[in-house]
């Protein structure tokens, strides 16, 4: 998979990271992506070629791309290979969005955007060329894909395992983090659920000793971050030297290549509690944790180097001050070029300009007046220069003019009965 991805890019093609046809529940998504991307060739392995061909035979003949098993290609073919001349603004790959609420869209990631975001993450994490990584994330997912970009761009070493290996035995991931800690500082990333799962089922067996003291950073993102998952993981592995500052709640998205904001290298994860009634009015008002309407929100820290993140009124395009909830807008060289084959959606999402900026403490300072901004569709707020992500615009449930966040409704339901 890794070889095929980099080979496609070196040959001057646009790579499209995808998954095997037998992945449960993803057949329609795979068909939609193939229809949208219209690839000329599919790279796979000899062992998976039959299932790939079986899937393609279900498609109309005109939509069936050529299939190449890369491990069946003789090494001698490389003797005549001439690398393509690439420009930093050329497309490197298409990162397809999750498609949970719409048809998957291919985000056009240029070489500049990919390299910029990896370097931004290196600087934000205080990492170096000796960094060690351990990843079980799917390579077709933006978080998993960017992990394999670290070694060729910045040096270091990465150990890969399958998602199934982690889900079956979360201990494998944590143990490998400890193993890599013996050789240097360790950096990894995972969605929030993984920390809770590893805390439950990832501890070492009796009599086995691990050393996790060299784990420099574990990004927690790709889904809403909860303080309970962070605390459970930290508490479970503190006896093995796991630093209290290691878990890094983060914010990112495929349209920005991946990473946008995270907490400082020496910071511990932090949580505030906001009044639910005020949230319904688009205001972030901190309250005590035991207040009856308190809703926890974990800080995603600050926007990382050479990016801009501002909170905007989605109806007017005006920048909002601290404490007011609005849409998160992004600007930077790491932002994708647009959506593959979707001109109008690209303009609506990637081609926005701020109608007005704050005269003081503007988070758009340093960008040109005509700068193009990415509308994320996410809702967020700045409090004490920390970013808090409160939800998605499309997910809001509006009743009698008041906003209701689905995650709050889910939390209330889960607290009402242990059976939920």
Question: Which stretches of residues belong to each language-model region?
Answer:
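Conserved AMP-binding/adenylate-forming
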Residues: 1-24, 135-138, 403
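Short hydrophobic alpha-helices that are characteristic scaffold elements of the AMP-binding
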Residues: 5-17, 36, 141, 152-154, ...
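ATP-dependent adenylate-forming carboxylate-activation enzymes
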Residues: 13-33, 46-48, 156-179, 405-409
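Conserved AMP-binding/adenylation subdomain of ANL enzymes
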Residues: 115-132, 142-186, 201-205
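Conserved ATP-binding/catalytic segment of the ANL
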Residues: 297-310, 314-323, 327-403
